[in-house]
Amino acid sequence: MGSLKKDGEIGDEFTEALLYVNGVRRVLPDGLAHMTLLEYLRDLGLTGTKLGCGEGGCGACTVMVSSYDRKSKTSVHYAVNACLAPLYSVEGMHVISIEGLGHRKLGLHPVQESLASSHGSQCGFCTPGFIMSMYSLLRSSKNSPSEEEIEECLAGNLCRCTGYRPIVDAFRVFAKSDDALYCGVSSLSLQDGSTICPSTGKPCSCGSKTTNEVASCNEDRFQSISYSDIDGAKYTDKELIFPPELLLRKLTPLKLRGNGGITWYRPVCLQNLLELKANYPDAKLLVGNTEVGIEMRLKRLQYQVLISVAQVPELNALNVNDNGIEVGSALRLSELLRLFRKIVKERPAHETSACKAFIEQLKWFAGTQIRNVACIGGNICTASPISDLNPLWMASRAEFRITNCNGDVRSIPAKDFFLGYRKVDMGSNEILLSVFLPWTRPLEYVKEFKQAHRRDDDIAIVNGGMRVFLEDKGQQLFVSDASIAYGGVAPLSLCARKTEEFLIGKNWNKDLLQDALKVIQSDVVIKEDAPGGMVEFRKSLTLSFFFKFFLWVSHNVNNANSAIETFPPSHMSAVQPVPRLSRIGKQDYETVKQGTSVGSSEVHLSARMQVTGEAEYTDDTPVPPNTLHAAFVLSKVPHARILSIDDSAAKSSSGFVGLFLAKDIPGDNMIGPIVPDEELFATDVVTCVGQVIGVVVADTHENAKTAAGKVDVRYEELPAILSIKEAINAKSFHPNTEKRLRKGDVELCFQSGQCDRVIEGEVQMGGQEHFYLEPNGSLVWTVDGGSEVHMISSTQAPQKHQKYVSHVLGLPMSKVVCKTKRIGGGFGGKETRSAFIAAAASVPSYLLNRPVKLILDRDVDMMITGHRHSFLGKYKVGFTNEGKILALDLEIYNNGGNSLDLSLSVLERAMFHSDNVYEIPHVRIVGNVCFTNFPSNTAFRGFGGPQGMLITENWIQRIAAELNKSPEEIKEMNFQVEGSVTHYCQTLQHCTLHQLWKELKVSCNFLKARREADEFNSHNRWKKRGVAMVPTKFGISFTTKFMNQAGALVHVYTDGTVLVTHGGVEMGQGLHTKVAQVAASAFNIPLSSVFVSETSTDKVPNASPTAASASSDMYGAAVLDACEQIIARMEPVASKHNFNTFTELVSACYFQRIDLSAHGFHIVPDLGFDWISGKGNAFRYYTYGAAFAEVEIDTLTGDFHTRAADIMLDLGYSLNPAIDVGQIEGAFVQGLGWVALEELKWGDAAHKWIKPGSLLTCGPGNYKIPSINDMPFNLNVSLLKGNPNTKAIHSSKAVGEPPFFLASSVFFAIKEAIKAARTEVGLTDWFPLESPATPERIRMACFDEFSAPFVNSDFYPNLSV
């Protein structure tokens, strides 16, 4: 521990370092400088704070930090990412985690209660982070926050389950901004329509006035609830105050140590800092650790001396004077944002143009948690070439004031500060003291620019800062001075100096614009092999940004000088910002109650545990004594022969216990869910980057990772296949995977002249990362002297874990038990690819007879566990001049990766769904699974169905283009009908497609929306809108017949409560809740009397994975079967007496020695498709749906937003409408990510700047799932009414996967908008658009004068497929 000596140096005398956690005083020992706040909290047992990514990108680790501001003499509260915050950075502060709010026993905090009641928690892994972000906003706000502030505070939190709408609704009530918030149409903005339901007493949307067996949820009928309904009346605990001890405590310097020789210093004055810098010139200075922490964790960089400058007053100084504003380099970005907002309100408008630009740029800079700790100086001195702020400092005439260890101060213009890649004009004996920003002058304008993959919390692709100072010379304006700065175009932020020089002295008119654009092309040169790729896109953005700047300046000066040459009004949309509107939504459904619970919108059974952080996940399980931690040794090349494995360096690593390889496996090394075609540990050859070679165990997780990194593997590299097309050319297919489907006679149809027209083409689509918030993990231990093995795993398929471990260890399955309580999201990614993780951990556990815990880091999880398959479809389609489809000839390929896994089944479902909802008389489909040198791809929501349907919808769009008709017209004339026979010989029954489509078309007012989009497009050159409607038909069942079985175990206890155990896994989809509702209604008891226990292989054996959307059908039916068995046994007793309660009946049966336990079983009937004959039912039934979407794109940048989405599904009589609506919304937003945001970038021929076979996008920093700002502005969900499904339990239908594909409506709406943009330049022919439609693809498809210098009109960006 350290204190400040009289001579100003930090000494080694002990002084107590401390912090408060949830009101409890904690003394911090020396030796923890390597530890993050998250690790510390979880070591304390406060596991409600989750590790989702470890890089501050997901928000699952959010906590609130309170500190005392000695300037204002007040305590301040702010949200931080605990995964990045060094433990010692919060010394002397108060940390409040989710456990510090409310809990089930003493009452929930209003924020927790609201989220739980609003169905805002599904898997629950992200939930504590969202709650802490909202709680921090409330604690830090003097007044009720606005709706915009609420959504802004959540920008740093990701959710993969809900689609965000219920979260926004839950928190919006705290704005208290509108009395009509939950009362229908608001005077301020449309809201969601939640009400207190008289049937349940909980928030829903039914609007019903009475409790009926059948009630209709209708957006036109609302019952008011107010803030007081969730104001915490049941919350008996008190808010934690800022500890008085910390108010009085003097701030002292610190010197603390940590593992690996790290020393942490905290100086509290500038002089002390300069002395430390003189002694340790290579020390890393930090405030928030948002950059250094990632470098140390992901890049494994080692820094021996860390100096926290957050508490140095001189670096936090503010000085506002007549010339400008000077801000200290340690000032946090959130403080800078508040400061600029205050200045804009107080200073004359002409002085604050730069301040306004910074405000706009900071809005989109990272998330709130990062802005709360990241500082100005860190962002500047890191000198990232894609820094959002540095180009603005450069353009704004800012000066950086630098001091050396002697106290000498110098100033340097920001535009001269950056010398090269992460190199600045500052010596090792210097630090950045402050930044001076001058006021802008009359006729001086500063503007910010940024284009990223995602608006919220994303790094820039290209950004910029631009300034012009105009001089009024009568009827003309001349450029007196100019700055044009870009980021993302070179190894450093740079000024386009030739362009600046060219502009000065010129008349500000359209001729200058055209000439300047030519100069920029030669001034800003991006090399063709530049890291980051997207070269043509980035080049075009440099011109687009300048054009936008020129328009913006011209618009601003036009009112003051009418002589300025004006642009047409249609151009001005180019400078209008993306609106940040409140997200709203409505839900419309009928409630058909069956018994006490089925049909009711019951809240997720675990919701209250999840909102309090009490719900346990695999990594939260208390570890047994003597537990070891494991980490993988992974291949670093895509295809190679292993020459040697040297673990000598690992053996000397701290905490190392052992390295286990294939030779150590006691059982069989070959594994696989269907075909055992992959090795658990590679022996002679590796076939992908990330293939497991062995597993290291050590005393801690970090030590295991460090030791694994020291294992030296030498290779002889071999040729690698890195795309589907490379596989096709090399005939590289997995054995026995060619599949064929046939209907009618395709060749005869094409040759006979029946087809008026024939089109041929290709459709490519990329893969998708599951991005479940909880990474994969297992805890394995031995029992009874090592003769049995038990495990807790994050998996959708405990039986597969049991089977893999049994197989690898050579044990009978009866001696292996796998348990799963809940998982933090799965989406198919934990169906099979999680099993090898448990198997790998079981080897050292079994051999050492010690518990072993293996939790994957986010980057490793994304790299090795597989993704949604990328696909290639080659089609030939014949049709009439009217648009009637006659024939489809389709070759379809998926990228299986280096093992088969489930790729064949995925391919088969894609082939089944390649008709989508269309009647096609003649069909021939041939499918193949490609072997490539990538990690094996696997199941993902939809399981190939979305890929097959997306291929179909692409050629449907092309038919429409060929015939100059709307796509909707082509769809409607080709819809399947009741009795239609598919190309796999299944007859459609209870087909509700037409009814559903018609109702949606009316409710979304599609024709009006299209007219309005056309009208908008005619008046706006650079913004375009598009609308689209898409249908879906999703088959329900496993396509492998034997998997359509389910078991359950039901116990009735003498107190009248019921315990249910079944083979399905709760992963947020509400399966346990629905199953409990089935049991409650069966016994006619309250839902609170039913408890669903963990999924365990020793309770229900041989369970199929929780997948295929069929779990509610199967396990609900199995539970009902068990309940009915018990009811039948109880009936003789019940018929003889009138019992007042179920408990009385149970007690009587017990005394009559009646068995109150039953095993239920369900077999899905009438299934079994024969691929040889091409006959048989592949599915039990279909879930039909349709969606409408309206989007707006910025043709100059490729940015887009979804203005509206309306979704309608036929779910029969829903078991739980609220849960089903949540599944629909979540699937839609996840699908939106697939078609428009999420792009996997691999090292392949298309991305040569990435190491071959390696995944670049292996974390939230580079891979962008939708954030709260990406959900549609208006998201409406309706369930078709009055259509019970006779083929599933209680007339319901499956919901998990069917809505996913409906997000393609956004994709095709984008394409319609692009079509409008291309029409502006005379490009009216059909054009391909690959998925995902990222900003790069959108912008480059909108060919214009700003992209023409770099590409032709038929240019399409590369895609990893």
Curated annotation (Swiss-Prot):
EC no. given is 1.17.1.4
Amino acids binding FAD: 285-292, 365, 375-379, 388, 432, 450
Q: What Pfam families does this protein's entry cite?
A: Ald_Xan_dh_C, CO_deh_flav_C, FAD_binding_5, Fer2, Fer2_2, MoCoBD_1, MoCoBD_2
**Enzyme kind, highest EC tier:** oxidoreductase
- Which positions does UniProt annotate for [2Fe-2S] cluster 2 binding? C123, C126, C159, C161
Q: Which GO terms describe its biological process?
A: purine nucleobase catabolic process; response to reactive oxygen species; response to water deprivation; superoxide anion generation; xanthine metabolic process
Q: Which residues bind Mo-molybdopterin?
A: Q796, F827, R941, A1108
Effect caused by changing E831A: Loss of activity
InterPro entries per the UniProt record, alphabetical: 2Fe-2S-bd (IPR002888), 2Fe-2S-bd_dom_sf (IPR036884), 2Fe-2S_ferredoxin-like_sf (IPR036010), 2Fe-2S_ferredoxin-type (IPR001041), 2Fe2S_fd_BS (IPR006058), Ald_Oxase/Xan_DH_a/b (IPR000674), Ald_Oxase/Xan_DH_a/b_sf (IPR036856), Ald_Oxase/xanthine_DH-like (IPR016208)
* Domain of life of the source: Eukaryota
This protein's cofactor list reads: [2Fe-2S] cluster; FAD; Mo-molybdopterin
Record keywords, A-Z: 2Fe-2S, FAD, Flavoprotein, Iron, Iron-sulfur, Metal-binding, Molybdenum, NAD, Oxidoreductase
Indicate the residues that form the catalytic site.
E1297 (proton acceptor)
Cofactor stoichiometry and binding remark: Binds 2 [2Fe-2S] clusters.
Its tissue distribution reads:
Expressed in roots, leaves, stems, flowers and siliques.
Stored PROSITE patterns: 2FE2S_FER_1 (PS00197), 2FE2S_FER_2 (PS51085), FAD_PCMH (PS51387)
Question: Which PANTHER family does the record cross-reference, listed alphabetically?
Answer: XANTHINE DEHYDROGENASE
SUBUNIT field? Homodimer.
Q: What does this protein do?
A: Key enzyme involved in purine catabolism. Catalyzes the oxidation of hypoxanthine to xanthine and the oxidation of xanthine to urate. Regulates the level of ureides and plays an important role during plant growth and development, senescence and response to stresses. Possesses NADH oxidase activity and may contribute to the generation of superoxide anions in planta.
**Family to which this protein belongs:** Belongs to the xanthine dehydrogenase family.
Protein name listed in UniProt: Xanthine dehydrogenase 1
Species whose genome carries this gene? Arabidopsis thaliana (Mouse-ear cress)
